[in-house]
A protein has these predicted regions:
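Intrinsically disordered, low-complexity Pro/Gly/Ser/Thr-rich segments with frequent PxxP/GP/PP motifs
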Residues: 308-353
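Class I SAM-dependent transferase core
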Residues: 49-90, 96-98
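A short SAM/SAH-binding and catalytic strip from SAM-dependent methyltransferases
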Residues: 164-178
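A short glycine-rich, Lys/Arg-flanked "PGG" loop and its adjoining helix->strand segment in the class I
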Residues: 179-194
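Asparagine-centered strand-capping/turn motif at beta-strand->loop junctions
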Residues: 289-295, 299
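A short acidic, Gly/Pro-enriched loop at the edge of an enzyme's catalytic core
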Residues: 156-165
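Conserved class I S-adenosyl-L-methionine
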Residues: 194-218
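Class I SAM-dependent methyltransferase SAM/SAH-binding core
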Residues: 98, 104-155
Length: 469
């Protein structure tokens, strides 16, 4: 089932993957890809893909105003807890606030009530039709302090130096040019102004019901916002599936303490943390970590982080970015989603200590798992396609890329409850190919007819046809 939403499409996965795709769009895609193939040009431009990869994420397409009703779904109150989010912002009457990428005004209308009397709300969107939908809802609710702002993809067009709070709810990942947008947001903030940023979680799987390019990791967000001249004041994790960041302009007038953030390996080198790693199961590694300094700190870790086992146990590799807030002096538990390396070895258990190493320890697996974390692919000039990012797909990709495993040897171990082994292997091959590995040189390619025969996912079938030409 496909439900069009504000920033994403929610997918209900089962074994019938052809029914979990947009049938009509893929039929058109098939015709386009076939024509492109006949013209001898069936690869996307390398430069465009490189530019996107260098950003460490793939910006998503923005949501059309045609899906505006979904923004007002009743379930959103439970899923996103908007009133609690606004409570954390501590808005006051007279505040000047803005909702960037406001859509139907879901947050803007709530803020309007909190900043009255005397306060104003700038409701910014890049679609005039969306702003008209917002205006109608504002009229229905009798609100008089909401002003529509038509922005552009590179400038929110907000008044300079006036805004006390800007909220960006599940929209930042859609900004195709975030640098100028963040510069515009920075200009709009009052001297003590702040930004509340909501993004679905990439790291722990709680946001996996969302398309891959509609989720972000703490590591990705902080990297981009710091580069744009912001500093992290707080990170709140009370929502079921979303991160809530509070940012402010770096070096500004606010005197509140900031939340210092560090890459795990930098923190270890600086003596800021102590950490231990232990086996858990075939999908996770358990870390125990504590800070050595008195102030709370944020630690992030990269996809591809390597965990070396001893006693002939299976090494593990992080399959997503990770994050943990160290706000206590005692040891804290930290679970990292991981995948195993050597198929023939036993998994490490909770009694097996692991040695933490950088992703460069196994660059092939780092490259493959990075592509899995990106979670998208294209065929020719097709729209973005979204393979399932389940453990069995990730595991198959690692075994194919690293150990050149055969389908026959892997089949029983990659038979997940939602993804048949043939689909897991086919999608794994897509990720392996996107990591720069020639899949036709892998032993599993000798079994390609067994794998691809009968698959009903048209994107996979087109991809396969292009590989066999």
């Amino acid at each position: 089932m496909v439900i069009h939403g504000a920033c994403a499409v929610f997918w209900s996965h089962d074994d019938r993957y052809a029914e979990a795709t947009m049938r009509f769009g893929l039929k058109i895609l098939f015709l386009i890809a076939w024509v492109v193939f006949l013209l001898g040009s069936f690869r996307a431009p390398a430069l465009a893909q490189t530019d996107r990869a260098d950003r460490h994420r793939v910006p998503a397409e923005f949501m059309s105003y045609l899906g505006a009703d979904w923004l007002e779904r009743a379930e959103r109150v439970e899923q996103e807890e908007p009133e609690r989010v606004l409570d954390m912002m501590n808005l006051n009457p007279g505040d000047v606030v803005a909702d960037v990428g406001c859509g139907s005004g879901y947050y803007a209308r709530r803020m309007a009530q909190r900043v009255a009397p005397g306060g104003r709300v700038f409701c910014e969107d890049i679609q005039p039709e969306m702003l008209e939908i917002m205006r109608e809802r504002v009229r229905e609710e009798g609100l008089t302090n909401v002003e529509a702002i038509l922005g552009t993809p590179t400038d929110p067009q907000l008044p300079a130096g006036e805004v006390d709070w800007i909220i960006i709810a599940d929209v930042y990942h859609e900004m195709s040019d975030p640098e100028p947008m963040l510069a515009g947001i920075r200009r709009a903030l009052a001297p003590t102004g702040r930004v509340a940023l909501l993004e679905y979680r990439l790291e722990d799987g709680s946001g996996d019901q969302i398309k891959a390019d509609h989720v972000m990791s703490v590591r990705q967000v902080v990297l981009e916002w710091q580069a744009a001249g912001f500093e992290l004041e707080a990170l709140h994790e009370f929502l079921p599936s979303q991160h809530l960041f509070f940012f402010r302009v770096a070096g500004g007038q606010r005197q509140d303490p900031i939340l210092g953030d560090y890459d795990l390996f930098e923190a270890l080198d600086a003596g800021l943390v102590e950490v231990e790693a232990w086996g858990a199961d075939d999908q996770n590694v358990s870390l125990r970590i504590r800070r050595t300094a008195p102030d709370p700190i944020l630690i992030t870790s990269p996809v591809g982080m390597y965990f070396e086992a001893s006693n002939e146990k299976r090494d593990m590799v992080a399959r997503r970015d990770g994050w943990v807030i160290l706000d206590e002096d005692d040891w804290q538990e930290w679970s990292i989603r991981a995948v195993g390396r050597q198929r023939e070895r036993d998994l490490p258990t909770s009694n097996d200590e692991l040695t933490i190493r950088s992703p460069s320890t196994a660059p092939v697996m780092e490259a493959v798992l990075y592509q899995v974390q990106v979670g998208t692919y294209t065929v020719g000039n097709s729209p973005t396609l979204y393979p399932p990012r389940t453990h069995v797909v990730e595991q198959a990709a690692v075994w194919i890329a690293d150990a050149d495993e055969t389908y026959r040897d892997m089949e029983s171990e990659i038979a997940g409850p939602r993804v048949p082994p043939s689909y897991a292997t086919a999608f794994a091959l897509v990720f392996v190919e996107r990591a720069g590995i020639d899949v036709t040189t892998r032993r599993v390619w000798d079994e390609r007819q067994t794998i691809f025969r009968g698959l009903r996912d048209q994107g996979l079938n087109i991809w396969y046809q292009l590989q066999t030409q």
